[in-house]
C-alpha cells in the first residue's frame, strides 16, 4: 500500500533542467472524463503534536463518500481505525490533542422547497472507541467556530458560538472530554465577532460593525486588561486592506497586521496596542500584495515570526528563521519543480506531513519520519499524471487603455495556433493562484489553450488594480477579458476564428456579458452559475456577508445581461446548479425565459442537487458539466 523512500535531509540535491526540452512532446493518450470528474481520492493528512498517529481523509467512491483512516505513524501498514458518517459528508479534520480528533462534516437538507447545508463538528477518540461527541448537537450552530487549542491545557479548546441566537457569538471554553462549557467572553454590539486569542489563549482581538459610520472596526486590548481599544476603522469611502494576523511573541503589546497604510500594495507591519503606533514596513513588494506571515505553531515557538509569503506565479516564501528555511530547503530538494507544503508537523519535527503539487500535478502526500524516512501516502487524483498535463506560463499583457493585466496561460501539447478559451475567475474580489487548476488542464488536455486574465478588480496586485474594477462590470473589466484573447492571437498562440469565453460565478457573468458585445470576437460562450440581473445581486450574492454588503455592493455597476438579451450574438451554453445558495438559479432561469421568446442559439443545463462552489459539485455533476462543456466547444465554436 505504501511506497517507501529513504533519504537524508542534509544531503543537497542538484536540480537538473536538461530534460525540459522534451516537455512539449505530444502524448496521444486522452484520459477518460472520470480522471477529472472523480472527486479527490485523498484530501487531507494530519498528525498530532506527539507525532504518534496519522489521520487521513480518503475517498471510497468517485463521489467521495469520505472516511477517516487513523494509523500509528510507526506502522503505516497496520489495519487502520476507520471513521465514517453514513448520512453526513466528512470535510475536514484536525487534532485537538494527542488523542482526540475534531471531524467536521456537512449534510444537505431538503425541507419542502428549501434546500440547504447543515454543518457540524464531532470530537472522536483517535482509537475509534467511544461515542462521537458533538458540541451543541440540537441547537442552531450559527457562528460556531473552533478558535484555538490550548497548548497548556489539552483538555479544553476555545470556540465561538451564538448561544443566545442573536447573531452575536460568545467565546466559550469547552471540555473535550466531558462536554462542559464555560463562557469566558460575551460578545456585544461593539465587539461582536472575529475574536482572536493570543498564544496563551487570552481573547485580545475582535471586530464589529458601527452602524453610525457604516464601517467595520478592529479592536484589541492589552494583555490582562478588559477595555477594548479601537485600532482600525474602514469604510467604503476609504476602502483599503487591513487584516489582523496574529500577536507578536517578542512583545505582548504588539500585533502583526497586513495593510496598505498609504501604499498601493499591502505590506506587513507591527502595531503597538498600548502606544497606537505602527512599525516601519517589515516586508512588502512594489507590484504584489503580501499574503501573510509565517508564524511558529509549536509550544516552543508559538507566535514567533518565521517569515512572509506572497504570490506571483506561485506562492513564494521569504524566511527570517534560518532553521525553518533549512527544513523547507532540505525537503524541497527532494521534490524538484514541485510546490512543497508542510501541512502538519509534530512538536519535534520527527513526523511531518508533506504535500507536493505543481502546474502539472494535482498533488501527493508523504509522511517524513525521524528526519530521514519518507513514506508515500497517496495522490489526490491517481489517474492524472504530469505527462497528461500542460505547462502554465505567467505573463502580463497590455489592455486597450494601457493597463498591464497579469494572466496565466495553459498551453496544450502540440503546435499552435490553438482554439482558445478565455476563463475569467469568479469573485471578482479574488485572484487565481494556479498551482494545479482542474478546469484549465481539462481544456488543455483536449487541445484548447486557456488564458486566465487577472482583470482589473482582481485582488493581489495592489489597490489601484483592485479599485479599477469598481462599477466597471461588463465594461473595462470585460475589455480586459477580450484583450486577453487578442493577446493570444497576436502572439500566434490562438486561432482568431476559434475563440470562446467560459467562466463560473463572476466568470459566468463575464461569459454572459461577453456573448452580447458588439463586434464580438468570440465564436461561443459558456456561462456557469452567473449573475444576469445586477439589480438583484445585493439581495442574493451578499445576503449573509456584511463585508460584501458594505464594501462590494456599491461597486457592482455596469452591464446587466438581462437587459440585453436581444443582443446575444454567439451560441451560449448556460449551466447552473439548482440549489445554488450564492447565485440563485433564478438568475439563469430568468435569462433562459427571456431567450425562449427570441430566436437565439442557446442550451440550458441545470445540475440537479448542485450548489455553487466547486467543492459542492459531485462526480455526477462534474461528468454532466464537463461533457456539455467539451461538446459545446467542439460543435459550436
Where are these regions (language model features)?
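Glycine-rich His-Gly loop
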Residues: 310, 357, 423-427, 577
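Active-site-proximal cap/loop segments of hydrolase catalytic domains
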Residues: 455-637
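Beta-propeller folds
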Residues: 14, 23-351, 359-360
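Cap/lid segment of the alpha/beta-hydrolase catalytic domain
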Residues: 386-497, 504, 538-540
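Non-catalytic accessory segments flanking enzyme active sites
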Residues: 193-196, 317-413, 438-441, 445-446
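Bacterial N-terminal signal peptides that target proteins for export
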Residues: 1-8
Amino acid at each position: 500500500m505504501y511506497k517507501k523512500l529513504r533519504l537524508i535531509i542534509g544531503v543537497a540535491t542538484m536540480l537538473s533542467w536538461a530534460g525540459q526540452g522534451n516537455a512539449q512532446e505530444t502524448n496521444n493518450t486522452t484520459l477518460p472524463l472520470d480522471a477529472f470528474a472523480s472527486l479527490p481520492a485523498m484530501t487531507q493528512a494530519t498528525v498530532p503534536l506527539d507525532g504518534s498517529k496519522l489521520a487521513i481523509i480518503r475517498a471510497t467512491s468517485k463521489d467521495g463518500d469520505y472516511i477517516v483512516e487513523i494509523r500509528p505513524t510507526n506502522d503505516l501498514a497496520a489495519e487502520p481505525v476507520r471513521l465514517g458518517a453514513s448520512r453526513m459528508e466528512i470535510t475536514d479534520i484536525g487534532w485537538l490533542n494527542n488523542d482526540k480528533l475534531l471531524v467536521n462534516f456537512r449534510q444537505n437538507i431538503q425541507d419542502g422547497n428549501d434546500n440547504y447545508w447543515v454543518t457540524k463538528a464531532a470530537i472522536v477518540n483517535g482509537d475509534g472507541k467511544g461515542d462521537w461527541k458533538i458540541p451543541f448537537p440540537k441547537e442552531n450552530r450559527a457562528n460556531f467556530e473552533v478558535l484555538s487549542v490550548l497548548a497548556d491545557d489539552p483538555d479544553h479548546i476555545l470556540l465561538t458560538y451564538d448561544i443566545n441566537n442573536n447573531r452575536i457569538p460568545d467565546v466559550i471554553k469547552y471540555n473535550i472530554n466531558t462536554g462542559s462549557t464555560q463562557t469566558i467572553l460575551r460578545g456585544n454590539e461593539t465587539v461582536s465577532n472575529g475574536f482572536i486569542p493570543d498564544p496563551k489563549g487570552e481573547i485580545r482581538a475582535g471586530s464589529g460593525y458601527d452602524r453610525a459610520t457604516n464601517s467595520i472596526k478592529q479592536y484589541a486590548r492589552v494583555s490582562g486588561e478588559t477595555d477594548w481599544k479601537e485600532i482600525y476603522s474602514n469604510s467604503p469611502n476609504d476602502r483599503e486592506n487591513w487584516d489582523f494576523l496574529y500577536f507578536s511573541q517578542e512583545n505582548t503589546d504588539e500585533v502583526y497586521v497586513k495593510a496598505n497604510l498609504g501604499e498601493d500594495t499591502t505590506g506587513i507591519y507591527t502595531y503597538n496596542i498600548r502606544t497606537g503606533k505602527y512599525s516601519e514596513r517589515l516586508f512588502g513588494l512594489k507590484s504584489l500584495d503580501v499574503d501573510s506571515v509565517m508564524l511558529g505553531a509549536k509550544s516552543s515557538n508559538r507566535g514567533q515570526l518565521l517569515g512572509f509569503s506572497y504570490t506571483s506565479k506561485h506562492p513564494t516564501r521569504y524566511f527570517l528563521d534560518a532553521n525553518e528555511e533549512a527544513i523547507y530547503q532540505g525537503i524541497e530538494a527532494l521534490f524538484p519543480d514541485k510546490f512543497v507544503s508542510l501541512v502538519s508537523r509534530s512538536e519535534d519535527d520527527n513526523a511531518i506531513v508533506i504535500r507536493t503539487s505543481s502546474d502539472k500535478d494535482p498533488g501527493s502526500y508523504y509522511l517524513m519520519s525521524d528526519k530521514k524516512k519518507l513514506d508515500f501516502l497517496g495522490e489526490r487524483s491517481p489517474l492524472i499524471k504530469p505527462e497528461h498535463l500542460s505547462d502554465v506560463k505567467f505573463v502580463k499583457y497590455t489592455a486597450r487603455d494601457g493597463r498591464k493585466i497579469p494572466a496565466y496561460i495553459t498551453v496544450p501539447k502540440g503546435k499552435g495556433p490553438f482554439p482558445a478559451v478565455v476563463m475569467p475567475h469568479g469573485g471578482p474580489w479574488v485572484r487565481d493562484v494556479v498551482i494545479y487548476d482542474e478546469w484549465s488542464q481539462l481544456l488543455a488536455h483536449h487541445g484548447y489553450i486557456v488564458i486566465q486574465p487577472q482583470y482589473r478588480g482582481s485582488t493581489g496586485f495592489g489597490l489601484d488594480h483592485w479599485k479599477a474594477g469598481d462599477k466597471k462590470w461588463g465594461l473595462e473589466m470585460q475589455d480586459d477579458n477580450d484583450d486577453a484573447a487578442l493577446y493570444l492571437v497576436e502572439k500566434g498562440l490562438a486561432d482568431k476564428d476559434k475563440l470562446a469565453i467560459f467562466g463560473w460565478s463572476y466568470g459566468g457573468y463575464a461569459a454572459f456579458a461577453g456573448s452580447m458585445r458588439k463586434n464580438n470576437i468570440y465564436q461561443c460562450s459558456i456561462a456557469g452559475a452567473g449573475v444576469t440581473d445586477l439589480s438583484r445581486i445585493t439581495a442574493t450574492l451578499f445576503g449573509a456577508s456584511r463585508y460584501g454588503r458594505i464594501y462590494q455592493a456599491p461597486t457592482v455597476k455596469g452591464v446587466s445581461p438581462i437587459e440585453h438579451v436581444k443582443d446575444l450574438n454567439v451560441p451560449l451554453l448556460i449551466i447552473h446548479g439548482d440549489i445554488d445558495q450564492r447565485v440563485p438559479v433564478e438568475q439563469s432561469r430568468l435569462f433562459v425565459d427571456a431567450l425562449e421568446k427570441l430566436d437565439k442559439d442557446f442550451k440550458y443545463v441545470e445540475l440537479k442537487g448542485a450548489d455553487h462552489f466547486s467543492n459542492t459539485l459531485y462526480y455526477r455533476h462534474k461528468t454532466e458539466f464537463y461533457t456539455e462543456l467539451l461538446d459545446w466547444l467542439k460543435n459550436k465554436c
